[in-house]
Every structure is written in C-alpha cells, then in structure tokens.
A protein has these predicted regions:
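Short, Lys/Arg-rich flexible segments
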Residues: 1-231
Length: 231
C-alpha cells in the first residue's frame, strides 16, 4: 500500500504493507525493500517535476518566481531500512516581486531619476486573472518595485508617515523623502508563498503521483525477476 501526502511544505512518500510485492517476488522477497526504495525515490523525483510544471501553468511567475518554485527539493531519500522519501520547500516566503508586474523592472530608487516610474504599478498572481492596479490604502503608498542590496527585486509600499534610518541606497544615493524630510519605511507586498502554491496544486497532481508509484513498484518487481532469471 502506497501513501503519498503533502502538508505544510512537505511531501512524504512511503510504502507500507508490502505483502503484494513480496508475493510477486516469491523466493526473492528479501529484495522487496530494495525494489521499494528505488520506486519511492523515482516517484519523489517525478512528483517534484510534476508539481513545479503544474505551478508554472497556474501562476504568473516571472523568472525569479520560476526559480523559487524549484526550491521544492528532496530532503530525504528512501533507503532499504527506511522506505520513505520527503520533498521540502526550503524557502517559505514569497512576495509580489516574483510574479508578473507592469513595468517588469524597477524604475524607482535607481539613482536620482524617478521620471520613468508609472503613475501606478500593476501585477497579477494567477495567469487566468487580469492585471490589478496596486493603489495605496490604509496608510500605505502605492506599490512599486525596488531592487535590494541582496539583488532581490521586490514589490514594496511605503508606510506613510513612518521614519526609516536607511537614508541612502546601497550605491550611496539619497533616498526619496516626504514633505517632512523623512525617508519612509518600506513594507514588502505579500503574495502566495511557494509552499502555498504547491499545496494548492497538489490535489491536481496527486493521482498521477500515486499511479506513477504503483507503476514503478511493478517495474522494479519485474526487473528483479528478470535479473534473477538471467543467472
């Protein structure tokens, strides 16, 4: 009996109750764990491939967002003594900068030139959705893209009336100030995390993963029997 579960950023693949596999192997039933191990690890790789591909078709991720989806990695491989493989999202957070935006690159805080900035930025998370304007509300400014010293490009808002101690950019330029002469604090605009995206698409992928695991188990049994027959 196979068991494939996904929750809280972890996908676990196990095989329990291997009576059917043992019966199929007959005198070679001692090789059951080895056969199951190979099938489980192959399924983990296939599950990752399917989940990343499905997420790319659903979400309007940009190049950075596509890389972020691939943070789903195999943290644990199955072994003969532990028939379990685990996929895990290493980076949990996401921001709107990983999705389609218009413009697609920062135009604010690039030196002292602000003239290329749009009157309002637009963005979307789902490919099936239209672009939405990022207008400000509740004491927050309109959204805009900014490139951080780490190289990450994020969608942020200014907290109107706040005061930041970061008065210069990484290149030493003076930052924009409000009427009081203060640099306002930046707040990243959130979006579905890679964990949330994979969790959403998992029900669409699960049947294929379950079927693949059964196929791999059968293929490994046949391979073991074929090798034994050649000896």
């Amino acid at each position: 009996v196979s068991n494939v579960t996904y929750s809280a950023g972890n996908l676990t693949i196990t095989v329990a109750g291997l009576d059917t596999v043992e019966q199929a192997l007959g005198d070679l039933k001692r090789k059951t764990p080895a056969a199951a191990k190979v099938a489980i690890n192959a399924t983990a790789r296939q599950a990752r491939k399917l989940m990343v591909a499905k997420a790319k078709t659903r979400y309007a991720v940009n190049a950075a967002g596509r890389r972020h989806l691939k943070d789903l990695v195999q943290r644990k491989k199955a072994s003969n003594s532990s028939l379990m493989a685990e996929l895990h999202i290493a980076k949990m957070r996401n921001d709107l900068g990983y999705f389609k935006t218009s413009p697609a690159v920062p135009t604010h805080f690039t030196g002292m030139d602000f003239k290329d900035g749009p009157s309002v930025w637009k963005a979307k998370v789902l490919k099936s959705s239209g672009m939405k304007t990022l207008t400000g509300a509740g004491g927050m400014s309109k959204g805009f893209l900014v490139k951080f010293s780490s190289g990450h490009v994020g969608m942020v808002q200014r907290r109107i009336g706040s005061k930041s101690s970061h008065t210069r950019t990484a290149k030493g330029y003076k930052r924009w100030t409000n009427a009081k002469g203060n640099v306002e604090k930046l707040v990243t605009m959130g979006s579905p995390s890679a964990t949330a995206m994979h969790h959403t698409i998992w029900p669409e992928v699960e049947p294929s993963v379950e079927e693949y695991l059964q196929e791999r188990l059968q293929a490994q049994v046949e391979r073991v029997l074929a090798r034994a027959g050649k000896k």
